[in-house]
Amino acid sequence: MKRINYLAIAVLSALLMWSVSDFTELRPNPAQAGAPTEIRGVWLTNVDSSVLFSDQAVTATLQQLADRHFNTVYPAVWSWGYTLYPSQVAEQAMGYQQGLYPDLEEQGRNEALEAAQGDRDLLLGLVAQAHERHLSVIPWFEFGFMLPANAPLAQRHPDWLTQKQGALPVARRYQEGRHPRVWLNPFHPEVQAFILDLIAELMANYDVDGLQFDDHFALPVAFGYDPYTINLYRQAHGGQSPSTNPYDAEWTRWRAAQITDFLDSVFRVVKAQRPNAVLSVAPNPAAFAYRESLQDWPRWREMGYIEELIVQVYRDSVDNFRNTLRDRTIQQAQGHIPTGVGILTGLKNQPVPIGLIQQQVQVARDMGFAGVSFFFYDTVWTVANGETWRDRDRAIQQLFAQPRERSQL
């Protein structure tokens, strides 16, 4: 496909302006000294939520968050196989500039709803309104390398997909929730170029404060058995094929290292376009992330690629929550970069009691973490049994009684 020159410009600029060693020096976390700071974030998604579907909803959402002394929003900008902003890169790759509504049913893309958006640029308006309210905006690549199985990108570029062992098409399928998914191959140069071009375009066109990946900037350990990746592995191992055991130590190490190498390119592109932008990662705890998703985020931190870490600690008891935060890799990160805690405030039809949320925030504070982020916006105010909306709102106001600047490097 015809390529936009965002990536070439970004990488050239990065090579001229930085070496990675400039960023890898271990630095103390400034959240531990000086004026009080705290990450007070919330994820904004287009799944089970309508907050991104109109300018009026965006305005009301941001005003509510600012009034309650939040300081950071993580809006989804890459979800369900589409960008949530007009993208030339996406249009060239899949034929669509953007897609705000997830393809939740078998009929696929809802063209009527998308057409009703007209020429609206969600992200442009959101960034402007957030900054007016002193909210930082760190766009969130929610789906990472994951796509719905029926996504236009997957249909147009089947060679970009990786697979498990077995016969196609079943070997490409991955079930998360009730919707079948597929995975872009993070080791394929055309996939990497597509993702880097999206990032360069985003950083060049929007006054954002950073970029965030989560547990989907990864690959389920069962994947990687496509012909391209097998041949790549053989080239690096004297003709030897990867183990049929997906958990094999060398096979796991090699795939994780390739993802780490790609994050180096991501970091350079971000910094070339927007030097002060924060590269944020919101993974699962390290042992699980590496074993099941080939994410070696402690290594990413050591290499200086991560400038903010929000570990997803979605636990239904305070003791489990506290014990997870005692993990050595989390403690090491806490002493190096702003490290916050992702707290689950609820899922669709599964509200989390506000008392548990309050306790978890307090544990994170007592243990010296740089802040918290709630998943996700709508459920912050979704009542659990025995609660009222006013109960939850009052609790949030008490948690964030005074405004705070974000913790940052």
Which residues does each PLM region occupy?
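An active-site-proximal structural segment forming one wall of the substrate-binding cleft
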Residues: 63-70, 126-130, 160, 183-218
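Aromatic- and acidic-residue-enriched segments that line the glycan-binding/catalytic groove
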Residues: 85-99, 145-176, 215-243
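Aromatic-lined carbohydrate-binding/catalytic grooves of carbohydrate-active enzymes
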Residues: 70-118
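Active-site-adjacent "subsite" loops/lids of carbohydrate-active enzymes
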Residues: 36-44, 49-52, 121, 144-205
